[in-house]
Amino acid sequence: MSSMYHDYDHLTASGKGLWSKFYGLVDAAVLLYDEIQRRGKIVSEEESQKRIFCLFPRRKRSSLVKRQQKLNGGFISFTSSSLIDLNQLPTDSEIEDPQTSDSQMKTLQNSSSEPCTSLVLFDYKTAESEKMEAKTLQNPSSELCSSLVLSDYKMAESEKMETKDPPNPLSLCLTGNTSRKRRAVEERKRTGGFKKAKVAPFPGTARDTPKWLVKVMRDMKEAKDAKLIFEKTLFVTDINPTQNRLSMPFNNLLQNDFLTSVESRIIKEDINNNKKIGVGAILVDQRSVKWGVMLKRWELKKESGKGSWNYNLICGWNDVVEANGLKEGDNISVWSFRCRGVLCFAMEQSSSSLALCLC
């Protein structure tokens, strides 16, 4: 104790004696205070437990309840008089008043011969499974309690039946609040008199990637995302050297999502501006020859004020036409893909024009 005070060694003998006694008194006071607090806490906890379990009896374990039931020779029946009315429970102020609490406790004791047992069994019933509820139904003694238990049992049985035998969605649809047109369609489906129309697959996704393009992409390394974007029969303007461009009308594109957001912004800013060159790209033909081209957007306005716009491959298209022997009436397909982020196109010719070119 003396080690807690740094100046204890510097005191005189009489001073040390006085301080030692003072320390002893302080320690005794602290111990006494702790003991009083501990006893007060124990008393308050016991009083609160007595008060709680007086109003709401402690729930017994299921094994004890079953043992009591066997000793009594059967299930203890639920009666309306055996259940305590929660509205008659005393309030805090009434419990503090000894006169009112004694009279009301007698009333609670007289309301049931076994209040604790009935409350335990009531809680036990709600916590047990549906099998225990079915057993309890075998010996109901009160109309009120038996009707409540019977309604719960019927609800449980109905849920089981719904799980085992789910309702027919067709019958629900026919009997529900639907329009006459929907009911007629469902009736046709059920009787087999209604058939769905066959829809032709989208041409952009129906065709597989050509084998020659697969080989080209494999040789280029890191090439991916091949998609068919355009098919066309060449016109005179497409092979005219003075035009030097392949026109791809936007409305005729099979897919229009082959550009990145940056490329779309560049092309939009370069509309009908000859000083801007557009977006650079690579075009590959069926001979695996690569050509440098530019993609631009041209807007065509009509006298009515309405207009349309096209994608055009320029700056190198004449070389592609000459090398592949393209002429008016030839059918071509244009594919797009990416190689390390660079926009690439692949041109596939019809078999007849390709044979002439190879000769």
Swiss-Prot record:
Main location class: nucleus
Pfam family, one: At2g31720-like
Residue span of region Disordered: 92-111, 159-192
PROSITE patterns (alphabetical): B3
Polar residues composition-biased segments: 100-111
DNA-binding region: 250-351
The entry's keywords: DNA-binding, Nucleus, Transcription, Transcription regulation
Localisation: Nucleus
CDD domains xrefs: B3_DNA
GO molecular-function term, one example from the UniProt record: DNA binding
InterPro entries (alphabetical): At2g31720-like, B3_DNA-bd, DNA-bd_pseudobarrel_sf
GO cellular component terms, A-Z: nucleus
Coiled coil: none
Keyword Phosphoprotein: no
Protein name: Putative B3 domain-containing protein At3g24850
Species, as recorded: Arabidopsis thaliana (Mouse-ear cress)
